[in-house]
């Protein structure tokens, strides 16, 4: 929801805007929601039509990216996933050569192995930043990290740190141009149905069941700490917040649509997309294709 660490301070959320009017009685502030994700299903469409439509959309996206990049180097955090692989593939397809891919972690990790294989196949320059326990200790206790944590949380989100040291090293070692634009593959997997593997019980075309959606959100997204000893106290509070975020159940055709809508608003917008603060902190532009 709109809450922050400060009870009297609220945040503007994804799909919302604020209208501020200066009146004789002071400022009149109104918040409006203009968009909420809810997937629906076409009445009739063939697989061939879907593929053609998808290709048209993707071509439009990456032609726009090339215009925005305007000759600058595009830096792609290339993992083993399909999202980032699609980015480098489309840039290759459209003939944009100023591309650098990078990966990070322990040497030989599976993500970086696939990353290098893809970059080599496409003839793209590839950079690797090694991680280790000792290096993480140094990074985490640095003054730069303290500044980043303060910069990136917005009093509402966890600072994303996974690739923060990698971008730091790429910058400090002059391995990428100072005017580079970072293009990650964030969030493309969600509308493609990635959650169907994690919570298949919701992907069965059943009509909306709010209790089932609420319990699945709690199970999937609130599992990193043990709050079972306070379940009777906390669960009603969490469920109330979840239902406030989802709004009217009738807008969703099924459980999966409601589950993904909450994920888009609360996980993607406030955590995954908040990882873009990494690039901003180190002085780089970014662009999201998906």
Q: Where are the regions that the model predicts?
A:
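N-terminal segments that mediate ammonia production and transfer
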Residues: 1-45
């Amino acid at each position: 929801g709109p809450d922050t660490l400060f009870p009297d301070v609220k945040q503007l959320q994804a799909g919302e805007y604020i209208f501020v009017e200066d009146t004789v009685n002071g400022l009149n502030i109104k918040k409006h929601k203009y968009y909420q994700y809810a997937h629906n299903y076409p009445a009739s469409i063939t697989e061939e039509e879907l593929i053609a439509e998808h290709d048209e959309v993707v071509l439009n996206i990456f032609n726009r990216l090339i215009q925005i990049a305007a000759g600058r180097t595009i830096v792609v955090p290339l993992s083993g996933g399909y999202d980032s692989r699609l980015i480098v593939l489309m840039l290759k397809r459209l003939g944009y050569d100023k591309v650098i891919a990078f990966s990070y972690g322990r040497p030989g990790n599976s993500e970086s192995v696939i990353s290098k294989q893809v970059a080599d196949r496409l003839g793209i320059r590839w950079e690797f930043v090694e991680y280790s326990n000792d290096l993480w200790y140094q990074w985490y206790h640095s003054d730069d990290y303290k500044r980043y944590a303060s910069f990136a949380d917005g009093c509402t989100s966890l600072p994303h740190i996974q690739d923060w040291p990698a971008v730091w090293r790429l910058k400090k070692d002059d391995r990428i141009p100072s005017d580079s634009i970072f293009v990650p593959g964030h969030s493309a997997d969600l509308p493609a149905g990635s959650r169907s593997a994690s919570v298949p019980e919701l992907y069965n075309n059943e009509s909306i069941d709010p209790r089932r959606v609420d319990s699945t959100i709690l199970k999937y997204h609130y599992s990193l700490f043990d709050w079972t000893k306070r379940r009777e106290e906390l669960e009603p509070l969490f469920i109330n917040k979840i239902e406030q975020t989802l709004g009217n159940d009738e807008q969703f055709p099924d459980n999966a649509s409601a589950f993904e809508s909450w994920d888009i608003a609360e996980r993607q917008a406030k955590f995954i997309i908040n990882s873009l603060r990494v690039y901003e902190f180190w002085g780089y532009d970014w662009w999201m294709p998906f």
